[in-house]
A protein has these predicted regions:
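Active-site neighborhood of phospho(di)ester-bond hydrolases with catalytic His/Asp-centered motifs
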Residues: 6-8, 35-40, 64-70, 111, ...
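Conserved beta-sheet core of the metallophosphoesterase superfamily
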Residues: 162-230
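Beta-strand-turn-beta hairpins that frame and shape the catalytic cleft
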Residues: 1-5, 99-109, 140-147, 198-204
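Short acidic, glycine-rich surface-loop motifs adjacent to enzyme active sites
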Residues: 139, 143-159
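A short C-terminal boundary segment appended to hydrolase-like catalytic domains
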Residues: 226-250
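N-terminal active-site segment of His-dependent metallophosphoesterases
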Residues: 1-59, 75-76, 95, 137
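Extended active-site neighborhood of metal-dependent phosphoesterases/phosphodiesterases
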Residues: 52-137, 142, 176-178, 223-224
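Active-site environment of divalent metal-dependent phosphoester hydrolases
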Residues: 13-15, 43-48, 70-78, 114-120, ...
Length: 250
């Protein structure tokens, strides 16, 4: 069995230290095959926050891919946001949007953040044509028999969670990756765990909760994805739930 830990929205700068320690202990004890971090590592994209995030991820000792979340772009420093938005990522560079191949499972990144959008709320999702083209190109390199999981920060379409991604270009992107053979799209942003089918082709949309203090009434959580052959299930593991994983409806 392959086991992936899907974690999101850690928000260093507003992290929950107990939740960080809980997740780290689970990684050390269970040694998952890989960790998929679907964005919002930081709260305000400050250098100290990225340094703390990098130290934490490196300490886990497992293969990691990291997506860029809206909180990982400078908000108030517009020069940094437009000219050098990723300068503070240097220590994390090898993990950012890193494709992974793990025992017949391919993790393919899809960028859903933008430096600028023609709307007031830049925290919402956006899939540009170049980002989608890169993802589809990476998918074409995946062996035919692999399961393909797309890793993004924002849900490509909203699924009824308490907050929304409102991802522009998301429906088009979802249809494109489904047609190209994706089996699931993993995301964060909304801080709610979910696993729901989309359409008739078997594609699933899987969202992780948060390890930060911004839990919106639910305890901190992450997803464990268990894969056997061509079948996989999502378990939402919530801090403080005694010894039992909570199966997400899907």
């Amino acid at each position: 069995m392959i086991r992936l830990f899907h974690v999101s929205d850690v928000h260093f700068g507003a992290e929950d230290q107990a939740a960080i320690a809980w997740f780290g202990e689970a990684v050390r004890r269970e040694q998952p095959d890989a960790i998929i971090m679907t964005g919002d590592l930081t709260m305000r994209a400050r250098t100290a926050e990225f340094e703390a995030a990098a130290e934490w991820l490196e300490s886990l000792g497992r293969p990691v891919t990291v997506e860029v979340g809206n909180h990982d772009l400078p908000l108030y420093n517009l020069f940094a946001r437009f000219v050098r938005p990723y300068k503070r990522y240097r220590r994390l560079e090898r993990m950012i949007e890193r494709p992974l191949e793990i025992k017949g499972v391919a993790i393919v990144p899809l960028k859903t953040t933008a430096r600028f959008q023609f709307r007031w709320d830049w925290s919402k999702g956006y899939v540009g044509r170049k980002a989608l083209a890169r993802t589809l190109k990476l998918m074409r390199r995946v062996p035919n028999d692999d399961l393909v999981f797309i890793a993004a920060h924002h849900p490509l379409v909203d699924v009824g969670t308490r907050s929304s991604g409102e991802t522009r270009g998301g429906q088009r992107a979802l249809e494109a990756v489904a047609a190209a053979g994706a089996h699931a799209v993993l995301s964060g942003h909304v801080h709610d765990p979910f696993d729901v089918p989309h359409g008739s082709g078997g594609l699933r949309m899987i969202g992780a909760g948060t390890l930060s203090t911004r839990t919106r009434d639910d305890p901190p959580s992450f997803n464990e994805i268990r894969i056997e052959g061509r079948r996989f299930e999502t378990i939402a593991r919530k801090m403080g739930v005694p010894d039992e994983a909570v199966t997400v409806a899907g």
